Amino acid sequence: MYPAHLLVLLAVCVSLLGAASIPARPLNLYQFGNMIQCANHGRRPTRHYMDYGCYCGKGGSGTPVDELDRCCQIHDDCYGEAEKLPACNYMMSGPYYNTYSYECNDGELTCKDNNDECKAFICNCDRTAAICFARTPYNDANWNINTKTRC
């Protein structure tokens, strides 16, 4: 093997080792954001739901501050149920990483029939939450709250 080939091989190995230490990004959350935009016809940016109340965003605890926050609590619980399914219990198959097939037609969301059991469950979690977000009032006072004192 030529020295140049060894250098290329070494560079590839180092790159792969570095990539292995980078946590994977939740691919499904991108789809969930698109579902939210479909259901609310783009009236409110998805980022407004990332840090709302006690449950919208990472984690969640306490009592939901309003109906919109309750939508997020139900969504969190739905993802928790998905994680218990045997079909969702293998590497990178859980609700945060497993992508699914769906359609958006004029604000109507449909999970496609070609989803396996896990994908169908996750898709329905996201669909239900997106519809809930679209029909529930948004209270600006509940965005970016102090969760330590209010939740």
Swiss-Prot record:
Q: Where in the cell is it found?
A: Secreted
Q: Which Pfam families match?
A: Phospholip_A2_1
| ATP-binding recorded as keyword | no
Q: How is the cofactor bound?
A: Binds 1 Ca(2+) ion.
- Could you cite one Gene Ontology molecular function of this protein? calcium ion binding
| One annotated GO biological process | arachidonate secretion
List, alphabetically, the PROSITE patterns matched. PA2_ASP, PA2_HIS
Q: Which InterPro entries match?
A: PLipase_A2 (IPR001211), PLipase_A2_Asp_AS (IPR033112), PLipase_A2_dom (IPR016090), PLipase_A2_dom_sf (IPR036444), PLipase_A2_His_AS (IPR033113)
Q: Which cofactor does it need?
A: Ca(2+)
Record keywords: Calcium, Disulfide bond, Hydrolase, Lipid degradation, Lipid metabolism, Metal-binding, Secreted, Signal, Toxin
Q: What class of enzyme is it?
A: hydrolase
Report the EC code(s) recorded for this entry: 3.1.1.4
Annotated active site? 75, 126
What SUPFAM superfamilies does the record point to? Phospholipase A2, PLA2
The record's comment on protein family reads: Belongs to the phospholipase A2 family. Group I subfamily. D49 sub-subfamily.
What the protein does comes down to: PLA2 catalyzes the calcium-dependent hydrolysis of the 2-acyl groups in 3-sn-phosphoglycerides.
**Descriptive protein name:** Acidic phospholipase A2 3
Protein's organism: Tropidechis carinatus (Australian rough-scaled snake)
The lineage is:
Eukaryota, Metazoa, Chordata, Craniata, Vertebrata
